[in-house]
Regions:
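Primarily recognizes the serine-hydrolase "nucleophile elbow" in alpha/beta-hydrolase
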Residues: 1-42, 53-54
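Extracellular/periplasmic catalytic domains that process cell-envelope and extracellular macromolecules
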Residues: 20-22, 62-65
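Acidic catalytic loop of the alpha/beta-hydrolase fold
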Residues: 35-36, 75-85, 113-114
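Short, flexible loop segments at the rims of nucleotide/cofactor-binding pockets, characterized by
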Residues: 46-52
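Short alpha-helix in the alpha/beta-hydrolase fold that links the catalytic acid
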Residues: 58, 67, 81-96
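C-terminal catalytic histidine-bearing segment of alpha/beta-hydrolase fold enzymes
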Residues: 72, 88-130
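Short beta-strand/loop motif that positions the catalytic acidic residue
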Residues: 65, 70-75
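Periplasmic peptidoglycan-binding/anchoring modules of Gram-negative envelope and division proteins
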Residues: 54, 59-64
């Protein structure tokens, strides 16, 4: 999820390989971190559980004009700590800057470890419809 979001929002990563992030039909991250990834925080010796929003945070790179971004998370009461809230923040920031192509789906009854299977049905349906 995190990698899909950072590639979608910060075009420099795909441009380095001659690709345009805006040519991707859609981004469909499942339970992705929208703040700086915990691995980066760990490498920096920062405490776990405290979000960092810096140049490595997809939410800090939200753009107005993107392909569709379909955020999929598990149930906010069952997901990893703050994961649904991070995605809700991402969707809110996108909306506030005028990006109408970001949507958030919360899959009730599923947690971080069980959300992928039902998320695949959403992804398949999206592909079939578009």
């Amino acid at each position: 999820g995190y990698l899909a979001l950072i590639l979608a929002m910060d075009k420099k990563y795909m441009e380095a390989y001659g690709a345009d992030a805006d040519k991707v039909a859609a981004y469909l991250p499942v339970s992705g971190q929208t703040v700086t990834h915990f691995t980066i925080r760990k490498e920096r010796g920062l405490p776990n559980g405290i979000p960092i929003i810096d140049e490595y945070a997809p939410v800090n790179r939200v753009r107005k004009d993107t392909p569709p971004v379909i955020l999929i998370t598990g149930d906010r009461n069952l997901e990893m700590a703050d994961r649904w809230e991070e995605n809700a923040l991402f969707a809110s920031v996108a909306k506030n800057i005028g990006n109408k192509k970001v949507t958030l789906h919360e899959l009730q009854g599923f947690n971080h470890g069980t959300v992928l299977e039902p998320a695949c049905f959403l992804i398949i349906n999206y592909i079939r419809e578009h």
